[in-house]
Structures are given as structure tokens and as C-alpha cells.
Amino acid sequence: PPSTVGVKAEVEALQKGIASLYPDINGLPELKQEASRFIKAFINVDLKPEGCVPVTGSMQGTFASFLTCSQCNEEKDTILFIDPGFPVQKQQLVVMGQKYETFDVYDFRGDKLKEKLESYLEKGNISAIIYSNPNYPSWICLSDKELRIIGELATRYDVIVLEDLAYFAMDFRKDLSTPFQVPYQPSVAHYTDNYILLISG
């Protein structure tokens, strides 16, 4: 059976007339507030509620993020994938008529990642970098050192990082399940302000 807490909240929302209104395009304020609190609790990043945008799924969030990133600077018309990743995300870019480049991170771990990323970023056409961490299907996890490299290069080259956290806190080598306590879910958000976190709820 469904959670009684969820059912009660839905009934209360219906009684308050939620079904008679179009949803706020920016998201329900209570949900934005709780998203901000969740990010602080499990990533240890301060993100204002107005920066949290609820969507109907991470794929919609990715689509909107691709659309936004690819239109910020007309000289930056390409998204860079650190693979392995989700093939459907590349398909989204095909649908949009946007360009993308890709490389497999397997041979470019640690310090090698910096040189590989710079070989793309120095061209000046990359608007965003996307990766999944923890990664599915390989289950590799980018280290804090690698996230720092990505973050610092994103700042230097003015690129937006799309961090897909679909498998949030699923690095089971350590317990990431206790809110407001180390260890936290690693994130590029500690190393740059140029980021979008895609969190599946």
C-alpha cells in the first residue's frame, strides 16, 4: 500500500484546491524549500530554494538543461559527455539538433582527466559537460580529485557542469544515508559555481 504520509498530504492538497490551479512553473515553494534542505543534508552544499526547480523527471530536467546551456553563448554549441552515460541523453540532443562530443573516462582517471578535458575545452565550443556519478552501468565513481579537476576547468573555461545524480548516494562503500553528517555525496558543486545538479526523487 502507498505511504499514509503521502496519501494524507495528497488529500490535504486536494482539499486546498490544488487541482483547480495550474502548477507554478517555478515549482511548489514547499518542494523547493525541501529540495534545498535535502541538498544541504546530503551533499553539504548551500543552494537557495529559488535555485531548485522541480520537474516531472530527471530526463525532463536534462532536456531543459541542455536547451538552456546550448543557448547561453552562440559560440558554445556542443555538449561534452564523460562516458559511459545514458544514450537517451544523446538522443535528446539529436532531437534538438544540438552537437555533442564524447569520450570514455575509463582510460582518463585521476590526473589524466585534466589533460583530456582541456583538449576539448580549449577549442571554445563546449557549453556544458555532463556525466553520471555514481555511474550506471559501470558503477565507477568519480573521486573528489576528479570532481575538483572538472569544477576548476569549468570555472576557467566558463562551462556549465551537468551532474547527473540519478544514482544518488549509491556508492555503498561508505554510508551516505545520514543527513547533515559526513560522509556526503561527492559533488562538483564544491569546486565550481557553474553547475546544475540533476537529482532523481
Feature map (PLM): residue ranges:
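Short glycine-centered segments of the SAM/dcSAM-binding site in methyltransferase folds
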Residues: T78, V159-I160
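Conserved core of the PLP fold type I
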Residues: Q15-A154, F168-T192, I196
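Glycine-rich phosphate-binding segment of PLP-dependent enzymes
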Residues: P2-Y22
